[in-house]
């Protein structure tokens, strides 16, 4: 298509004339934002309808398992919104959101959604973590202050937001671990008193080594979750921020990575080959 057109809602639309003093790329970004604001209510209705259909589909699937006399998979079971019997896990988690300028508007929305899901997971966990979102500023903060203003994020328990990244740059590096898929060293366990940093970025793998290089520059040790042990993923083994948080919370409860992955990750992504190898090893040890 020509440079005077832009893709909006899956359709090519003619771009209005570029205002004086503004580049074409700047105008495209601003125009997309204006189009989004104009159709925000429509988008909200579409999301509401999708959630309704997903809820109905979930109920049908659960009923099918019940009718067959089979156990309902954990991924279909809905946990209570708040776990009243929570205890502290002793670990700290930092969501490093210093990558605002590297994401487009849709990726900012996705990042904000993952943060809200991480908060929900922390509320439901049997052992909660102290979670802090650093570099909470620019478009991400604007998103929470405007579009998500009803979530009351400043009052979230065990979940803080700070505008700078002093916790990362000035904290005790000997008690920090930056989690990144780009390192060779694997994370074996989670230790109370340690702080685990997770990159708060949605970039579709555009910025490889981003978190790894930042950690190295700051002198922070890097580790990767044992993803390859249990998940079948092509290329770089990268999980969403939400999944990383959920896995860590589940591990604090079970102290078992295998059980944690099976509980958090959809079964279609789990690696049946690795599972079979482990079963064979266990059988050989028992003989």
Swiss-Prot record:
Renumbered to this chain, the Basic and acidic residues biased-composition regions fall at: 268-278
Q: Where is the active site?
A: 203 (proton acceptor)
> Record keywords: Nucleus included?
yes
Single GO cellular component term: nucleus
Task: Kindly list the positions annotated as binding S-adenosyl-L-methionine.
Answer: 179-180, 199, 203-207, 211, 225, 237-239
Question: What GO biological process, any one, is recorded here?
Answer: tRNA N1-guanine methylation
**What Gene3D superfamilies does the database record attribute to this sequence?**
3.40.1280.30
**A Pfam family for this UniProt protein?**
tRNA_m1G_MT
- Coiled-coil ranges from the UniProt annotation: none
Residues of the region (Disordered) are 1-27, 268-287
Molecular function terms in GO for this entry?
Answer: tRNA (guanosine(9)-N1)-methyltransferase activity; tRNA binding
Q: What is its EC number?
A: 2.1.1.221
Q: Which reaction does it catalyse?
A: guanosine(9) in tRNA + S-adenosyl-L-methionine = N(1)-methylguanosine(9) in tRNA + S-adenosyl-L-homocysteine + H(+)
Q: What is its subcellular localisation?
A: Cytoplasm; Nucleus
What InterPro entries does the database record attribute to this sequence?
Answer: MT_TRM10-typ, MT_TRM10-typ_sf, TRM10/TRM10A, tRNA_m1G_MeTrfase_euk, tRNA_MeTrfase_TRMD/TRM10
Tell me which residues make up the SAM-dependent MTase TRM10-type domain.
Answer: 79-272
Q: Quaternary form?
A: Monomer.
- Job of this protein: S-adenosyl-L-methionine-dependent guanine N(1)-methyltransferase that catalyzes the formation of N(1)-methylguanine at position 9 (m1G9) in cytoplasmic tRNA.
Q: Which family does it belong to?
A: Belongs to the class IV-like SAM-binding methyltransferase superfamily. TRM10 family.
- Tell me the protein's name: tRNA (guanine(9)-N1)-methyltransferase
Q: Which organism is it from?
A: Candida glabrata (strain ATCC 2001 / BCRC 20586 / JCM 3761 / NBRC 0622 / NRRL Y-65 / CBS 138)
Designated gene of the protein:
TRM10
């Amino acid at each position: 298509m020509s440079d005077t057109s832009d893709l909006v809602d899956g359709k090519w639309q003619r771009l209005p004339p570029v205002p004086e003093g503004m580049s074409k790329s700047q105008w495209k970004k601003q125009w997309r934002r204006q189009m989004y604001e104009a159709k925000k209510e429509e988008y909200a209705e579409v999301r509401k309808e999708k959630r309704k259909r997903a809820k109905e589909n979930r109920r049908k699937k659960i009923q099918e398992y019940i009718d067959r006399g089979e156990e309902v998979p954990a991924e279909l079971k809905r946990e209570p919104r708040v776990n009243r019997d929570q205890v502290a896990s002793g670990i700290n988690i930092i969501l490093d959101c210093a990558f605002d300028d590297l994401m487009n508007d849709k990726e900012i929305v996705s990042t904000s959604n993952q943060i809200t899901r991480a908060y929900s997971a922390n509320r439901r966990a049997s052992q909660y973590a102290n979670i802090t979102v650093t570099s909470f500023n620019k478009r991400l903060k604007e998103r929470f202050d405007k579009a998500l203003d009803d979530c009351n994020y400043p009052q979230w328990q065990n979940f803080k937001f700070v505008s700078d990244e002093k916790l990362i740059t000035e904290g005790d590096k000997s008690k920090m671990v930056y989690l990144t898929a780009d390192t060779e060293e694997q994370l074996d366990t989670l230790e109370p008193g340690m702080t685990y940093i997770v990159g708060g970025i949605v970039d579709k793998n555009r910025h490889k080594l981003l978190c790894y290089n930042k950690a190295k520059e700051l002198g922070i040790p890097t580790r990767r979750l044992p993803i390859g042990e249990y998940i079948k993923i092509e290329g770089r083994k990268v999980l969403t921020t939400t999944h990383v948080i959920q896995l860590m919370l589940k591990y604090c409860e079970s102290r078992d990575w295998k059980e944690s992955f099976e509980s958090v990750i959809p079964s279609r992504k789990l690696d049946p080959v690795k599972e079979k190898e482990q079963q064979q090893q266990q059988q050989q040890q028992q003989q």
